[in-house]
């Protein structure tokens, strides 16, 4: 069982990266699967999808499913469905297959520097991301966008994780940083300064 992110790095040597690279599917996951997601990218250059699949099961799941399909499979859908039919549906605003209009990209955010960022997102759960630091499973972060989040961890733990990322030189290499939710700190109203 690799749930909770505690043991996921123990299976990395046993994954068949050549086979993963050859399959025409994307690996989807989030948080607890951070180690595996980043290892797959480092070893195959195949960009995984950082997405909490559980969203497809909860409240607003119908909308989440539609947004997920539009975002991840729009190209495949356009190839499968008669293009004239797709154009007609889009023209009549019945179904928009453009990724830019996907609800997956509609969330509140705030820029602290600059006004836009575009690129490949790496990272995920900060603790799980750091478990692969210094290994062959840690990808080149140059010009990537770093996503960091955590469910657990008090302020001291999170500060330590950020310090380690800084000491690895990651912050100087990435072109952007997404700070996600740090759930335990948020619930206790703790703030990083």
Regions found by a protein language model. Name each.
Residues 1, 28, 145-149, 178:
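Structural motif
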Residues 1-23:
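N-terminal small/polar loop signature for handling phosphorylated ligands or for N-terminal nucleophile
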Residues 4-6, 153, 182-183:
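Short glycine-rich anion-binding loops that position phosphate/pyrophosphate groups of nucleotides
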Residues 47-127:
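Conserved anion/nucleotide-ligand pocket segment
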Residues 157-193:
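C-terminal active-site/capping subdomain that shapes the small-molecule cofactor and substrate pocket
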């Amino acid at each position: 069982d690799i749930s909770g992110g505690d043991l996921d790095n123990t299976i990395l040597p046993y994954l068949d990266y050549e086979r993963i690279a050859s399959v025409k599917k994307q690996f989807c996951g989030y948080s607890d699967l951070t180690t595996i997601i980043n290892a797959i990218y480092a070893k195959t250059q195949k960009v995984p999808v950082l997405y909490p699949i559980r969203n497809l099961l909860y409240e607003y799941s119908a909308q989440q499913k539609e947004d997920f399909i539009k975002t991840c499979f729009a190209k495949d859908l356009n190839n499968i469905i008669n293009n004239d039919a797709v154009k007609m549906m889009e023209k009549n605003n019945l179904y928009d297959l453009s990724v830019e209009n996907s609800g997956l990209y509609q969330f509140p955010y705030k820029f602290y520097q600059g006004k836009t960022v575009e690129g490949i997102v790496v990272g995920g759960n900060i603790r799980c991301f750091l478990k692969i630091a210094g290994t062959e499973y840690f990808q080149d972060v140059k010009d990537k966008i770093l996503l960091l989040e955590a469910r657990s961890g008090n302020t001291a733990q999170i500060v330590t994780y950020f310090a380690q990322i800084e000491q690895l030189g990651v912050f100087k290499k990435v072109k952007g940083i997404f700070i996600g939710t740090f759930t335990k700190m948020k619930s206790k109203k703790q703030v990083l300064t």
